[in-house]
Structures are given as C-alpha cells and as structure tokens.
C-alpha cells in the first residue's frame, strides 16, 4: 500500500489539512486495511510503503511489513525512545463478510474518486513495467 500516493491525491484534490500522522489518509488507509484483514483472519501480509517521515512509520508500528528508505531507517535507529506498537492483531476473529459481486465491487470502487483514479493509474503503471521487463528479458536472449 503506497500511502504517500493516497496523501498526495488528497492534498491535490481536497482542502484536507494534516496536523500529524493520525490525520494522514494514507496512514488511515493502511490502518483500516490491516484491521480488516486481521479481524477477519485473512492469511495475508499487509505492507505499508512510501513514507515521507518517521511519524508516518511510527503511526503504523506493528504492521506486518513496512518498506522504509535508508535515510528514514537511520533516523529511526538513532532515536532510542520506546516505539509502542500501534497496530495490534484482533483477538476476536469474525466471520469474513460475504463476497461482493463484480457489480458491487465496481460500484464501491466508483464511489471513491481517489480509489478509482489511483487504482487505474496503478494498473497502467504495473502493466507498463511488466512490458519493459519482458522486453529487457527478451533482449538478453
């Protein structure tokens, strides 16, 4: 989950004011995803990525995986204060919600402008990256 892209979209398209990581829509998104998957016992790894500062990372302490740049990692390593876990797996596991139909899924995606735009952009970028990789591999043979 590229939380920076979520934040950037909100800053460019809304009048959202961010006082700290708890107000960051990207941090809130990773937190919601983590809590949903753990509460329903989905067997997957939730990984947050694309951080700008240590506060965003600290707000997601306890997430299954975080990709952290070397600069931010050095800053975190130099800070000897306690880092309390912020994301804690659910103790009470709930039955998974019923699966959405394709139509319900598409409607839910279309109800959120940020999701609609960023999902489409992400798919296009991954497809372009795959094509470039395939061309590189083909050129080597």
Pin down the residues of each PLM region.
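Catalytic alpha/beta core domains of metabolic enzymes, predominantly
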Residues: 3-91
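Short, small-residue-biased leader/transition segments that mark boundaries at the very start
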Residues: 1-2, 126
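C-terminal extensions of enzymes
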Residues: 87-141
């Amino acid at each position: 989950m590229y939380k920076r892209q979520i934040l950037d979209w909100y800053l460019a398209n809304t009048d959202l004011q961010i006082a700290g990581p708890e107000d960051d829509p990207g941090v809130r998104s990773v937190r919601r995803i983590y809590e949903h998957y753990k509460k329903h016992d989905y067997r997957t790894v939730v990984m947050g990525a694309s951080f700008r500062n240590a506060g965003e990372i600290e707000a997601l302490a306890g997430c299954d995986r975080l990709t952290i740049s070397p600069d931010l990692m050095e800053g975190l390593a130099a800070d000897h204060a306690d880092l309390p876990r912020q994301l804690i797996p659910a103790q009470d596991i709930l039955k998974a919600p019923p699966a959405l139909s394709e139509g319900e899924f598409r409607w839910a995606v279309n109800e959120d402008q940020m999701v609609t735009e960023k999902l489409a952009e992400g798919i296009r970028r991954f497809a372009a990256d795959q094509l470039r990789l395939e061309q590189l591999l083909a050129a080597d043979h």
